[in-house]
Amino acid sequence: MRITHLGHSCILVEAAGQRILVDPGNLSKSWRGLTDLDAILVTHRHPDHVDPEHIGALVDANSGAVVRAEEGACHEIPALDADPVA
């Protein structure tokens, strides 16, 4: 398993051939432009954990990725296009 800190709350987890991005927020930019993601996880709706301005481009660039987020983020950020998790 490889865990890469991409700034503030954002991490990239790589394990068993899978790439999972966690909390791509607005206080880090190094996640922008990432591709080949298998999953995107947003733990909660604060902007430092999900950047509402740029998340749509990330989701579009990783159309095959599973996207999961806290329920409030799912409702407040339509570009996230995520299924809610508890």
Locate the predicted segments by residue.
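Metallo-beta-lactamase
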Residues: A69-A86
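Short internal beta-strands
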Residues: V42, S63-G72
